[in-house]
């Protein structure tokens, strides 16, 4: 076939699937050849010929009767004494002719790789330069610092930090407001602008700026009532600012109904604060500068951090300095003004938050493998400051916050650090609701996203993680439904994490989603908006795009090799099976370039396993399966003369492949591993024989019997052993069983495969006469149970298995190569994806098609 464009080839394939995969043929052979032809109701020996008109219907000449029959593409009338089933799967979407048309400049040109290498160096420099944190200026906080007074030599007051006042004077935006010009949030602009106007008015300067700022505030105050959500502690801080503005004679509409409502709300909070004066962190620290009139300044000093700040907040610290004259407060603020050039950020230091956020960002973008050492250094730093109380933005933070703590829990656990989920209990009230930090009764949306992602990594019986999940999932789903935030990037992230939690998130799919929604001008919100330049970073995004496309180009070359092998081996002509080369390749979930040999071996073996599964389920008789299995046990191709030719061909292709891959294993491991490799294959085919015996006898096993057999026949054992031996790490004989069958983690992943598969395939299998499934076996054991009861039970079993598998994966094991362990563990991902909605292997032309296109076919625009 001549080379077509990719889209043309895909279109032709879609139109031609039925004809190419005629279910009446086992293997399509040349005219005049003798062959077995297998229909869904039987098998016969035929000679291939065509009518005199040239291309047209196939005429099959029976060697036993001499009769002929024209077979249409839907015919299934060839009958003998051996009944056959047909699953009627759709054809291969990504067959040889489609994949071979793929072209990409990212493989041939060295320019892209050279630029990627340059970016890696620059981002490593960024890691190495991490200190106490890099963060954008805050007009709100700088204005508070500008308001601090000192006594001059003549006894009059003057600004103690004139550089801060100068910054406020020089940084008004064109619309009269202060803030981050590219991002408008009403609460943010009102806080920044009102306090800036106050600072200028206190020192009777910047009259033009005050006039413009006042006009902006007056126009926008009326819009507050339309806001769906106010920024954290806005109802405490903003009314206090308005009181100060009114005292200074700034002309604003103070009698607006919503402003009165805010003032009433604040008064109620002040009453609560006064009643709980001994519990200062729980009620004051997050909005300290909004509580001046009820503050006991002597008591508050015991909550000062080592660096002199209060909750790392320049605004709160400036307020304390104004009321106490504390020198440590002065030193903290003065150091910030020097560091940031006359202004201050909304919080400092942020050394823990910045390191965790940078690592999380890098890994989400799919480029973490370039920075393994830098990530380790960053996380070692965070772990040194980890506390069972949780952590805050910086190492000296006295009050932990949920966002940093949950992010720390997730990131540290992902990298094998010993951290307890009990730390989350510090952010939960008696009703099971979580809050952002001590003293707050609300929770920020971003904190809930991080909490949800942390709960993904739950181990068995971790109550704190279960509580986090119960709280976070409905909260996020409700946020999506009600659109309580206008932050597009955050909403896209919420959509992804809710739809594809950790046990369902293929790394390349996650990277593609994150890259597509990445905003290199992203802002976060505390009291006001802020940026972290290490995260709002175009270099990270550029590298992620280049890296994705470069790796994708390698994957395309591998897919070309694999589809070519599938075709040249003759397996593409076997028509009782699903042809799923690209789907099996996707299932490995291992994308790194150095694991090319692993992916190729896994895909070749996995494709044959799909074929064997269909052969056992819908084609072979029990005697044929036994003969096939005997050939596997004896490692002998001469025992197969009694089975159909197509089964003989499948055996020979498999036999040759295993021998070839074993030769590659010998080169990596330095010894012959065939004895290890044969064991899981024998177990695998023995289970198929057992299943067929049960089927032919009409026996439905108990749930326990079912799992012992069917969790093996799902096939992870034979399709993973050789691939992990090709990962470049030496695997000792005694370690094989620790990472592979019968290790706990391996059995748990296999269990999740088997049962998740059952929830989406049992009805089709039942229609074919295959009664045994996890659902049927559970119902047999539990009389009166419905299919719905069985599926709920199976989902609970799978959930438990995934938690236990996580525990086994993160459990320290110095003798087990981490790459091998990760390969086995990551196989849990694809089954959750493939069987999320439907049987994704049987019906791969819907959701799975889109995954494959995004990961392997469509490059990212650079």
Curated annotation (Swiss-Prot):
Stretch list, region Disordered: 45-66
Motif (DDXXD motif): 613-617
Binding site for Mg(2+) 2: 613, 617
Catalytic reaction annotation: (2E,6E,10E)-geranylgeranyl diphosphate = taxa-4(5),11(12)-diene + diphosphate
Cofactor(s) named in the record: Mg(2+)
E.C. designation(s): 4.2.3.17
Disulfide bond sites: none
Annotated protein name in UniProt: Taxadiene synthase
Source organism (scientific name): Taxus chinensis
